[in-house]
Amino acid sequence: METLRELRVNLGWTIQKLADESGITRQAISSAERGIPVRADTAKALADALSRGYGREIKPLDIKDLSII
C-alpha cells in the first residue's frame, strides 16, 4: 500500500498533472498528501485518476494514509 504522494510520484506526475487528471484543485491534493481529511467524492476522483494512470483499479481505501471525511 502506497501513500497518495508515492502513487503520484511513481507515475512521474506533478501535483498539477494529478489535478488536471482528477479535476481536484492543487491545494486539495497538497492537503490530502499532508494527511488533511478529504471528502469521499474527492478521494474517489483521485483514485479514479490514479487508476487511469496505472491501468489498474485503485480504490480510495487502497491509498495509505488517505483520510476521508
List PLM regions with ranges.
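Residues within the helices of the helix-turn-helix
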Residues: 5, 16, 30, 44
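Recognition helix of helix-turn-helix/homeodomain-like DNA-binding domains
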Residues: 23-38
